[in-house]
């Protein structure tokens, strides 16, 4: 009987410990014993912003946290807190940070998949690289279309057209273009504590954490001049794709300044299904230039990027 009581007490103690851990730390995994109040919801969101945001060491952030708690103290539901949290996340993470509602996430998942394009003009291969949002099958289709276009066509130079590419999943874009990129570090994420995480390309695979995609042929294409086209609608992952080409000798950037969302967001799920998209790292290119949501400036500023790129490629052919 005594042994049974000890076992029972032990189980009770373990359960109490487990429940205590969930109570104290469950928010990190979006696990709750009971639905959080709107005020708890706000505190959890602010704590995540505090831990991850790039600008949370500032006096402005300290004041913003206090003000946000005060402004939401009488909120009756989660929806009433969102406008205040939207303001707060911009202070914590900068302009690239935002809150995405569950319905917006659902709409985004239904966004029509846009396939990249490949065409030959003269002796130049022109690749149009749209933003990517889609499933793993579409990611594979996207990446392998670009890869096969690079390996199956005859051309003297390549135009990588990233104009209008606002981002999405980085992996299929970079993997599709990987025959043009040297293996090794493409760029590096740098957080507010100066910790670095390189994004690397090796043997047709990338460690960016996006779609699980592989290409059929990772043979490198060398020496071909590459023109990268950007404009003010090239943003986020579109810009990071462009930065993968920075510092490569046979590359020239043409067009206009990019959108200036050169940073990385981390996703945190909230209780109601909304997500915090918190900017947690800036980007360092292979030449050690650090982009803190700065735009990429092209080597050649032009309103006629495509025709200028074709002329530049012609000038590089010997």
Swiss-Prot record:
Gene3D superfamilies, sorted: 2-enoyl-CoA Hydratase, Chain A, domain 1 (3.90.226.10)
Transmembrane regions: 7-28
Topology of this chain in the membrane: Single-pass membrane protein
Record-level Gene Ontology MF annotations: serine-type peptidase activity
UniProt keyword terms in alphabetical order: Antibiotic resistance, Cell membrane, Membrane, Transmembrane, Transmembrane helix
Subcellular location: Cell membrane
One cellular component term from this protein's GO annotations in UniProt: plasma membrane
KW Coiled coil (keyword) present: no
Keyword Membrane belongs to the record: yes
GO biological process: proteolysis; response to antibiotic
Record-given protein name: Nisin-resistance protein
